[in-house]
Regions:
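Metal-ion/cofactor- or nucleotide/acyl-coenzyme-handling active-site neighborhoods
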Residues: 1-302
Length: 302
């Protein structure tokens, strides 16, 4: 088979000009082919959709505008269908329809590769699905790091999600793992320079759990609130590191308790994120030059 010579020439020129990789993080397909998506969305912005009930206070349909990329976590994909998605817990905790949606690019820890999904019976009970994560469309796998270092968070070759209960992180915090840490690390790896936070309430109560229906026992609510306090300390410590790498995180969650990042109104964030692709579209003249207008007929001689 003859290959296209212009494609070959462009490939050779690109390989010759390629700069050394600055981010050693690798992703893996279900067949464990190694890929890098470093800088894939270079310089763009994304909305990180967490699960706080304040999600119900904003018009999420605005996120369907051209130019806007969203990343969901956990079951926030039941509230808004994201472009990207990630998790750190067992895959069976997350709604199977999201897993089966080929239009959502999913980033998943490698240990979840062979784990089963779950489905819900009509009576609300759960059972194992016939499908495993590796059989789902649009899935990439990543390796996690078990140590959080606020001075190296964006530069390692794996994805930090917190520490185990026996070892302290760079701030002296033990445990306190979170999918939010993973999402921010992945978004930076993908090249996003600005991340807008939604559903980042950083407080949970018996009457304010999630943006979707779900039960939470009192001890789980206490655990989450303790986690939020530790994450707030980590994010305060990360601010100089983020500034050094020109990575902006902006909180657009109404009533959020997280004060580590600057706040912005949701509508203003949508306007900024969609501006580049928000101009009116004309389809004329892209395939062929527009025909010149016919000259105006001359006035009849008198």
């Amino acid at each position: 088979m003859r290959e296209n010579q212009s494609d070959i020439a462009a490939l050779q020129a690109g390989l010759k000009a390629r700069k050394p990789a600055r981010d050693g993080l690798r992703l893996y397909t279900a067949d464990f082919d190694s890929v890098s998506l470093a800088g894939f969305y270079h310089g763009r912005s994304a909305f990180l959709i967490l699960s706080g009930p304040s999600l119900t206070q904003v018009d999420l349909s605005q996120l369907n505008k051209r130019g806007i990329v969203t990343m969901g976590v956990n079951n926030s994909w039941s509230v808004h269908r994201p472009t990207l998605w990630t998790c750190v817990d067992d895959p069976g905790r997350f709604i199977d329809i999201g897993w089966k949606d080929p239009g959502i690019l999913k980033f998943v820890p490698t240990c979840c590769w062979d784990k089963r999904l779950r489905i819900q019976n009509p009576d609300g009970s759960m059972r194992n699905s016939a499908f495993r994560v590796r059989q789902m469309p649009s899935v990439l796998f990543f390796r996690r790091a078990d140590h959080f270092d606020h001075e190296r968070f964006l530069t390692g070759d794996s994805v930090p999600w917190g520490n185990d209960a026996k070892h302290a992180d760079s701030l002296g915090i033990t445990g306190k793992r979170s999918v939010m840490l993973v999402a921010l690390r992945l978004l930076h790896h993908l090249g996003f320079s600005t991340v807008y936070l939604l559903g980042c309430d950083f407080k949970m109560a018996t009457d304010r759990k999630y943006a979707f229906d779900e039960h939470r026992a009192p001890n789980a609510i206490r655990h989450n609130n303790v986690l939020y306090d530790s994450l707030a300390r980590r994010f305060e410590a990360l601010r100089p590191h983020f500034d050094k790498h020109r990575f902006r995180v902006i909180n657009c969650s109404p009533g959020s308790e997280l004060q580590a990042f600057d706040h912005m109104d949701f509508d203003a964030a949508v306007k900024a994120a969609s501006a580049e692709c928000g101009k009116p579209v004309s389809t004329q003249g892209w395939y062929e030059p527009n025909p010149k207008p016919a000259p105006a007929p001359q006035e009849a001689a008198r």
